[in-house]
Amino acid sequence: SVVELGKMIIQETGKSPFPSYTSYGCFCGGGERGPPLDATDRCCLAHSCCYDTLPDCSPKTDRYKYKRENGEIICENSTSCKKRICECDKAVAVCLRKNLNTYNKKYTYYPNFWCKGDIEKC
């Protein structure tokens, strides 16, 4: 769910998801128009694509359990849906951490109508 995703983002990046990622670029926090603006925005596109592979799941509301061992996120076995949601969320949190060096504050609260052009395919 968004609760676990938020915790993962804080743990991986040290940034609060709101406002750092909830309206960043063209893909973080929804919107999904135009090409990604940078590597951080591309992480959010990949996360959206991952969720698209889970049509029978409810990634924003299904709660799941995970733990951290030696700094790594470990998704705990529960239902197939919850495990797959957790893996999608883990991937985006790790991606955001790996791309902290290119995080650009000017893309926070980026107006969606500026996102033009073809959407990059998954």
Curated annotation (Swiss-Prot):
Where in the chain are disulfide-linked cysteines found?
Answer: 26-115, 28-44, 43-95, 49-122, 50-88, 57-81, 75-86
- Show the GO cellular component annotation of the record: extracellular region
Places the protein is found: Secreted
Q: How is its activity regulated?
A: Suramin inhibits the myotoxic activity.
Q: Where is this region: Important for membrane-damaging activities in eukaryotes and bacteria?
A: 105-117
Read off the InterPro entries from this record: PLipase_A2, PLipase_A2_Asp_AS, PLipase_A2_dom, PLipase_A2_dom_sf, PLipase_A2_His_AS
- Report if keyword Cell membrane is assigned: no
Q: Which GO terms describe its molecular function?
A: calcium ion binding; calcium-dependent phospholipase A2 activity; phospholipid binding
Alphabetized UniProt keyword annotations? Disulfide bond, Secreted
Signal peptide start-end: none
Task: Report, as the record phrases it, the tissue specificity of this protein.
Answer: Expressed by the venom gland.
Q: Which family does it belong to?
A: Belongs to the phospholipase A2 family. Group II subfamily. S49 sub-subfamily.
Question: What name has this protein been given in UniProt?
Answer: Basic phospholipase A2 homolog ecarpholin S
Give the organism the record lists: Echis carinatus
Task: Give the lineage.
Answer: Eukaryota, Metazoa, Chordata, Craniata, Vertebrata
